[in-house]
Amino acid sequence: MISFFTKTTDMMTSKKRWTALVVLAVSLFVVTMDMTILIMALPELVRELEPSGTQQLWIVDIYSLVLAGFIIPLSAFADKWGRKKALLTGFALFGLVSLAIFFAESAEFVIAIRFLLGIAGALIMPTTLSMIRVIFENPKERATALAVWSIASSIGAVFGPIIGGALLEQFSWHSAFLINVPFAIIAVVAGLFLLPESKLSKEKSHSWDIPSTILSIAGMIGLVWSIKEFSKEGLADIIPWVVIVLAITMIVIFVKRNLSSSDPMLDVRLFKKRSFSAGTIAAFMTMFAMASVLLLASQWLQVVEELSPFKAGLYLLPMAIGDMVFAPIAPGLAARFGPKIVLPSGIGIAAIGMFIMYFFGHPLSYSTMALALILVGAGMASLAVASALIMLETPTSKAGNAAAVEESMYDLGNVFGVAVLGSLSSMLYRVFLDISSFSSKGIVGDLAHVAEESVVGAVEVAKATGIKQLANEAVTSFNDAFVATALVGGIIMIIISIVVYLLIPKSLDITKQK
């Protein structure tokens, strides 16, 4: 059989494979941590640099926009150039750009840094996943490795605000960026000695598809940007509508071009495989259902429980604990009972956690939330099985494609979930609050608008006017909107579990490569 892939993993011992996995897991941890750590640094950054409201949004959003746009082309680039070189280059860029924060004296400079960090992240994130596919050719070992990879991603996202809060208690906002530097140095040095190189052979590595690159970047960035705009400004603005139509058009052209190509940047035909489709649907829709609920949980802890952002991060740890406990055993359960049982069941367990928040959440207590978060984390651990399904029927030469698709599904699910379910929560909050009942007390015009926009705004208006009842009703309305959104998220996850169950072949064994 002709090999289209050049790799140096054949002689790797078991010890070297698992040591390499540690490097890849730490790499992913750092990048996902960086996606959330800025939340803690933003208030101090705003006080020092005084960015405009628009600049603040770009500081927050530019990272995810660039990540979404560049993941597919840069994963294809890594396949051709070499995954090890791409990963180490990504980390070198990650460290150098983070170090440049020392020279940041304007919001524009910080935006540029976040842009370059997004490029580096797009080199790192899919490459960690595709290298696991190359290093662990035994499907059973690979499933366990993917569980570790999944844990690293979850822990990074949860610990970002916690680490950020701890740093900011002692240092300036710059530390939220500088924390990346030692991790980047360690990753580059360790990667040089511990990671194997792998890339497409010359027979398979053809010329670079520039039109597909442009279509992918512009289409994905346009799609993510427009969805974010809808969630912030509503549906009335015409510009996001124009952008989303153009973005979808470019994505459709990209798909058609790659379907007709003998050497596609993204092999769209992978979606014809039921296990691949099941894994990607699970990744996208689970993040869609979860993202807004977790964001609202953080707000609930800060507004209702009156915790600092740092303590709120600590109080979200039960979810990470649930994930860490169950992710390592999920592949073993899937090997014994089959992914057709384990993945839908895991998603169902996460749904139960959501339902608990609703049915025992009037009002919600932290003990109830903690139990729900443990179940959500335990259920999310089953997504390691989704990763195994995605890689199971993916040939080694298409590992970069599969990794890019999976990462894109997580990112898009997060963006769409926050936009759609976040907007639902805001709408329910306004319905439950009934601000008109406070008109007789002077809460009209701009004051009423601020109170209706968010629970934080309502609390501030209540403090300014001395109307304590407004704060109490706003908090109650936010609580009810939050748990109602959790109910909707749980229903979505039940539907996902059924769809995934129907898609996964009954006899599929994740310990045997297709």
UniProtKB/Swiss-Prot annotation:
The chain crosses the membrane at residues 24-41, 58-75, 87-104, 113-130, 147-164, 173-190, 208-225, 238-255, 279-295, 316-333, 342-360, 370-387, 409-426, 482-499. CDD domains: MFS_MMR_MDR_like (cd17321). Residues 42-57, 105-112, 165-172, 226-237, 296-315, 361-369, 427-481 are extracellular. SUPFAM superfamilies: MFS general substrate transporter. GO terms for cellular component: plasma membrane. Keywords: Antibiotic resistance, Cell membrane, Membrane, Plasmid, Transmembrane, Transmembrane helix, Transport. It is a multi-pass membrane protein. PROSITE patterns: MFS, SUGAR_TRANSPORT_1. Coiled coil: none annotated. GO terms for molecular function: transmembrane transporter activity. It is found in: Cell membrane. GO terms for biological process: response to antibiotic. InterPro entries: MFS, MFS_dom, MFS_trans_sf, Sugar_transporter_CS. Residues 1-23, 76-86, 131-146, 191-207, 256-278, 334-341, 388-408, 500-514 are cytoplasmic. Pfam families: MFS_1. Confers export-mediated resistance against antiseptic and disinfectant compounds such as intercalating dyes, quaternary ammonium salts and diamidines. PANTHER family: MAJOR FACILITATOR SUPERFAMILY MULTIDRUG TRANSPORTER MFSC (PTHR42718), METHYL VIOLOGEN RESISTANCE PROTEIN SMVA (PTHR42718:SF47). Belongs to the major facilitator superfamily. This is Antiseptic resistance protein. It comes from Staphylococcus aureus.
